[in-house]
């Protein structure tokens, strides 16, 4: 039910990518890799663009369209499938600003389930296809904007839209 767009990976791309694990092609998060440098061995990077066939996806959850009206059944199905997927625990710094230029920083644990980990499920029948970098490039920090503008990616996106 899933088709995921990937791009050729560049050195500055962070966060994992496409890998073969136990004979199965799937997305692997950078934080799930045993060694940080293993990320540089990955050839393709996730664009975060996913095409979904609704009825097969619902079937993966043990649901159909009619079942969507039953909130309790949907919640139970989501919890059951989520229990089969990895959970990541990350430490984040949360800032609380107060007064004039004052702030406190609190360490916070964040539990995450990631959509890309649906590809860990063999019955998800996931396909991957390579797209041009301008179509799927992720920008994760401001420092990437200059390169994005210079390499033609910004112009590519601009030409997709009618700006008024």
Predicted ranges, named:
Residues 1-164:
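Catalytic core of tubulin tyrosine ligase-like
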